[in-house]
């Protein structure tokens, strides 16, 4: 099942991508941390270090921290953010 709906692109999330190696996604409400981790690793061919999740007004957000060997900016480029 595809849990990732779309990347969230704001000034804050872009700074997080550049400085902290984190990518923020809008995800399905039924998504779990493990499911998001597996989907990000499979879809973007990266290693995920950590997943934080929160419920927001517009849905559920997942903040994915990539392992140091991988670049969130590169993944963002592949998604068309940059």
From Swiss-Prot:
The family this protein is said to belong to: Belongs to the universal ribosomal protein uL23 family.
Coiled coil: none
Entries under SUPFAM superfamilies matching the protein: Ribosomal proteins S24e, L23 and L15e
Keyword Ion transport applies: no
Assembly and binders: Part of the 50S ribosomal subunit. Contacts protein L29.
Function (record text): Binds to 23S rRNA. One of the proteins that surrounds the polypeptide exit tunnel on the outside of the ribosome.
InterPro entries noted in UniProt: Nucleotide-bd_a/b_plait_sf (IPR012677), Ribosomal_uL23 (IPR019985), Ribosomal_uL23-like (IPR013025), Ribosomal_uL23/eL15/eS24_sf (IPR012678), Ribosomal_uL23_CS (IPR001014)
GO biological process: translation
Cysteines engaged in disulfide bonds, as pairs: none
One Pfam family here: Ribosomal_L23
Gene source species: Picrophilus torridus (strain ATCC 700027 / DSM 9790 / JCM 10055 / NBRC 100828 / KAW 2/3)
Protein name: Large ribosomal subunit protein uL23
Molecular function per GO: rRNA binding; structural constituent of ribosome
